[in-house]
A protein has these predicted regions:
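Hydrophobic repeat-domain scaffold segments
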Residues: 1-181, 210
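Charge-dense, extended regions
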Residues: 162-317
Length: 317
């Protein structure tokens, strides 16, 4: 699967087969990916997350969910970005592809590509054959999609932890050249926060990859049964993103309840992922001003310029 051409062929084939041999082969491939890594645990922070969590919370509070009138513009910008890299028409710009041939020396990148494709392939099977797969097969596929994504995510977290010292040193060196006399402690703090923002964004993208692969309304019961029972916080995040950003549902109260529950047990990092899920939903979905304001207040998002001007506007006869 890590060879791009073969991966694309297998994705295509999985549009047309639910053969148990194919499913078993893909699941077996998934189980060896990141086999040395544990699944990412949202209750156990890495050193980088521990050192920057307060700054991350402050950063994501600054996100603006905009107004209902901004939704179309936001979607248009998304399409332009997808067009620019060739995603929308099925091609991919040469600069945005990675060499995943057998000669590639970067085995870790090959494994990441393999993991992403494996999730996509399992998603193709379960979406196309929802009615023909029995409950056990669906549960097995969903569980392995979740497991490989969390092992991959844990691998990223470990890598970011190892990389942070080198990155901070680089930032300090560059800042000293550009801004002599600047406090190194402040530079180091900002550099770590920037790195953690990148990690948190990557974290959400991995959650979204799984929810996108499971994006079929009739899969909701199987997803609920499998992810809520065995997958802890990460399963709840996938379910929330699946409903809000893939299936067009509006479980705003469910999102607020999860955010409050995580905040009460001081799981600030997982709460930030909920905040990102809701931010993405609010930016891409037409909702009433009442619901948008409810989201803004519950998640402490900054007021939009639209609402500020609207409240200051004098009444007309």
């Amino acid at each position: 699967i890590y060879v791009e051409a073969y991966g694309n062929i297998l994705i295509f084939v999985c549009h047309f087969t639910n053969d148990r041999r194919v499913i078993n082969a893909v699941i077996s491939n998934a189980k060896v990916l990141f086999a040395e890594d544990d699944e990412f645990d949202y209750t156990k922070y890495t050193k980088l997350i521990n050192e920057t969590i307060a700054g991350i919370d402050s950063t994501f509070k600054q996100l603006d969910i905009g107004s209902d009138g901004d939704v179309s513009d936001y979607k248009a910008r998304e399409l332009k970005i997808k067009d620019s890299i060739g995603e929308s028409d099925g091609s991919v710009d040469e600069d945005s592809t990675m060499d995943m041939t057998e000669e590639s020396t970067d085995q870790r990148m090959s494994e990441i590509s393999n993991g992403i494709r494996t999730i996509d392939i399992l998603g193709q099977i379960i979406r196309n054959y929802t009615g023909k797969l029995n409950a056990q097969a669906k549960s097995e596929i969903i569980s392995e999609m979740h497991s490989v994504s969390m092992r991959m995510l844990n691998s990223w977290n470990v890598a970011f932890d190892l990389f942070q010292s080198e990155f901070v040193e680089f930032c300090i060196e560059q800042a000293e050249k550009e801004f002599p006399g600047k406090a190194t402690e402040q530079i180091a703090k900002r550099a770590k926060e920037f790195l953690c923002v990148m990690l948190t964004t990557a974290n959400y993208s991995q959650i979204h990859n799984v929810s996108l692969a499971l994006s079929k309304e009739t899969l909701i019961p199987a997803c609920e049964e499998t992810l809520r029972k065995n997958s802890g916080i990460s399963g709840k995040l996938i379910l929330l993103d699946l409903k809000m950003n893939c299936l067009g549902r509006q479980p705003v109260d469910e999102a607020i309840d999860l955010f409050i529950a995580l905040s009460k047990v001081n799981n600030i990092y997982a709460a930030q992922i909920v905040r990102l899920i809701v931010w993405q939903f609010a930016r891409r979905t037409h909702i009433s001003h009442v619901v948008r304001d409810k989201i803004r207040q519950a998640f402490n998002f900054i007021p939009s310029a639209f609402l500020q001007s609207d409240t200051n506007e004098p009444e007309t006869a």
